[in-house]
Amino acid sequence: DSDIGFNPDDILTLAAIAEPGSDKQIVCGPYPKKCISWEKVKVAVDKGYGDENPQALADYVGDYVFNPASGKNQIRIDEVAEVMEGGTGFMMIQRSAFEQYEKAYPEFHYLPDHVRSEHFDGTREIMAYFDCVICPDTKRYLSEDYMFCQWARNAGIKVWMAPWMRLTHMGSYTFGGSLEALAKCNVSATADPNEKLK
């Protein structure tokens, strides 16, 4: 997405992890939601992490756009980790994943009603890979990011994350942070207080 800040080397890293033929067909980088988690900042303050440099507290502000894979409440920050859901704002997806997804969900084909271009003239179906839904099992709202990941996993495609990356998310503030810093504080990287990093 255009509001994600990243190091260009991170793109090459995702490409290397998700290279054709790899079992890692979907790989994302972690970026923070557009909010400040004041309780995490307070933990860092209480531990003295901002005493010498108060700007270092910016590493502790975020809830990240991912959820760990089912049954996993710890993620190592120095290796690729399987996740249940990750943000599509910084994600690399192999063509094979799109093809597998399309075969699994033929009901997501539709005829577009925007027909003012050569390739969208209303005569061919296109695929809705990203949509917002209410999960029928949990009644949880799934954003287009999370819906895509959940349906991909249901189609047998695992979703992976490179947790060492440091991305930003631009809003009214440049939301940043560091999963490594959050691990040092022993706080959750998401809004779930039971999930931990190590």
Feature annotation, model-predicted:
Residues 1-4:
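Short acidic donor-binding/metal-coordinating loop in glycosyltransferase active sites
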Residues 7-133:
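Conserved catalytic core of nucleotide-sugar-dependent glycosyltransferases
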Residues 103-198:
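C-terminal catalytic/acceptor-binding lobe
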